[in-house]
Regions:
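Extracytoplasmic gate region of multi-pass secondary transporters
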Residues: 24-25, 216-271, 327-331, 335, ...
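Extracellular/periplasmic helix-loop-helix junction of adjacent transmembrane segments
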Residues: 27-56
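Helix-breaking motifs and short loop linkers at transmembrane-helix boundaries and internal kinks
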Residues: 36, 69, 90-96, 124, ...
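Conserved MFS/SLC helix-loop-helix module at the cytosolic interface between two early adjacent transmembrane helices
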Residues: 56-92
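Cytoplasmic helix-loop-helix junction between adjacent transmembrane helices
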Residues: 100-140
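Helix-loop-helix hairpin linking two adjacent transmembrane segments in secondary transporters
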Residues: 135-185
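Multi-pass alpha-helical transporter architecture, strongest
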Residues: 176-181, 300-308, 391-424
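Juxtamembrane intracellular "pre-TM" segments in multi-pass secondary transporters
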Residues: 184-222, 246, 424
Length: 424
């Protein structure tokens, strides 16, 4: 029961994590005109200041999480990002919004590597797909709740007050993390065997990570698939601008509608992705990424076609639902896979490295590149620049499909090979 209580609390923190992270995108139809931002500036704000600090700090935080008291580390991270979320509400322009995003990135970089390490020490391996899927239910629900806040409170409270409010909520939740105790780490049964913070142990963890990535094609292809999938996720930060400017919706109304879709479709995807990927791995000779291969292959046509249809079309709404469902399905299978392909002592580090590649490469290309692309298309007098940009980046993300296939195909062979490499 304690493991499930921990899982619920960490999922709640992850939900807040993505509410705060997504606020700029959810309030894009409020913030962009208020601050007079270009598409490139908006795309930059949603990624570069946050992602660079989030990704690089996350790698160090992953190493740190393998060595120190994890609930205390989580508490520090949540408090840090919440303070700067509140300060974002006072932004007067591009620079004053970019600066707090850097510190939000540092704070949020702590949560997932540390949480996944805690969960791996709390649940057996065969339930990690479920545990990771449940934890990552915070992603689509957080994105959806962020949109609901914009839709229901944006006009009445204003976007600035919403940032202040969420910062205060985060402070309370962050301090609550101190009520939890750290859990014994697997394969470390005594105080002497518990990892400690030192230069030598840090170097050894990094060497072990490099050795695992070099030895496992399944691990490499899982990481690569995630990067290409995150390119279209980065571009989707322009979704609300697309819906209002090129599909004619009212900004508050469409934020409410898509917010509810995100909550329920994403939550369903998390549960389905976690449970079915666990079943797939247990009952076939393939790894969890093969489940994502079939999911991506089957949903691809609608994922592109719905961009071109009228908003009163049934296909249009099915496309939005599938997008959030697929987002929900992604996290449980992939994060379980990357953790299971490395030694127990570097689980938090590999999660942090995976997050670094997803965000620093995938999201940055999708969001900032998407903004530059949309600005160029507007200057070239394209009739629907957001539509064309989103389609282009959706096509690029197709490369993730063969990567999922190869990762799923190689998973069980690589698991055996890595066991021999690390003598486990």
């Amino acid at each position: 029961m304690n493991a499930y209580r921990l899982l619920f609390f960490l999922t709640l923190l992850n939900l807040l994590n993505f509410v705060d992270r997504q606020l700029i995108a959810s309030f894009s139809n409020f913030i962009v005109p208020d601050l007079g931002l270009t598409n490139a500036q908006y795309g930059f704000l949603t990624t570069i200041p946050f992602i660079v600090f989030y990704s690089i700090a996350g790698l160090f935080m992953g190493v740190l999480a393998d060595m120190v008291n994890r609930p205390r580390l989580i508490a520090f991270g949540v408090v840090l990002w919440s303070v700067f979320t509140a300060l974002t509400g006072a932004a007067k322009g591009f620079i004053s919004m970019a600066l707090p995003r850097m510190f939000i990135g540092v704070g949020e970089s702590i949560l997932t590597p540390t949480s996944m390490s805690l969960l791996s020490d709390s649940f057996p391996s065969k339930k990690m797909g479920f545990a990771a899927g449940f934890y990552y239910m915070g992603v689509p629900i957080g994105v959806g709740v962020s949109l609901l806040i914009a839709g229901y409170l944006g006009e009445s409270l204003g976007w600035r007050n919403c940032f202040y409010l969420l910062g205060g909520i985060g402070l309370l939740l962050g301090l609550s993390a101190l009520l939890f105790k750290d859990r014994p780490r697997k394969n470390a049964n005594s105080a002497e065997e518990q990892p400690t913070l030192s230069k030598e142990s840090t170097v050894e963890i990094v060497k072990t990570l490099y050795k695992a990535i070099s030895a496992s094609s399944a691990l490499r292809f899982t990481i690569l698939a995630g990067v290409f999938y995150h390119i279209v996720l980065g571009a989707s930060g322009f979704e609300q601008l697309w819906l209002v400017q090129e599909r004619g919706f009212e900004r508050s109304n469409i934020a409410q509608i898509v917010g509810w879709i995100g909550v329920f479709a994403g939550m369903t995807g998390n549960l389905v992705g976690g449970i079915l990927s666990d079943w797939w791995q247990e009952n076939t000779d393939q790894g969890r990424p093969m489940f994502l291969f079939w999911l991506a292959l089957l949903t691809l046509p609608i994922g592109i076609y719905y961009r071109f249809v009228e908003p009163d079309s049934f296909i249009f709404w099915i496309g939005i639902v599938i997008g959030y469902f697929q987002l929900g399905c992604f996290f449980g299978p992939t994060f379980s896979t990357v953790q299971e392909l490395v030694p127990d002592r570097i689980r938090a580090t590999v999660v942090a490295f995976y997050i670094l590649t997803l965000n620093l490469i995938g999201l940055t290309i999708g969001s900032w590149g998407g903004g530059l692309c949309a600005d160029w298309m507007e200057a070239a007098n394209y009739q629907e620049p957001y539509t064309m940009m989103l389609v282009v980046f959706s096509v690029i993300s197709i490369i993730s499909i063969p990567c999922y296939y190869l990762a799923g195909k190689r998973y069980k062979q690589d698991k055996i090979v890595l066991g021999k490499v690390f003598n486990e």
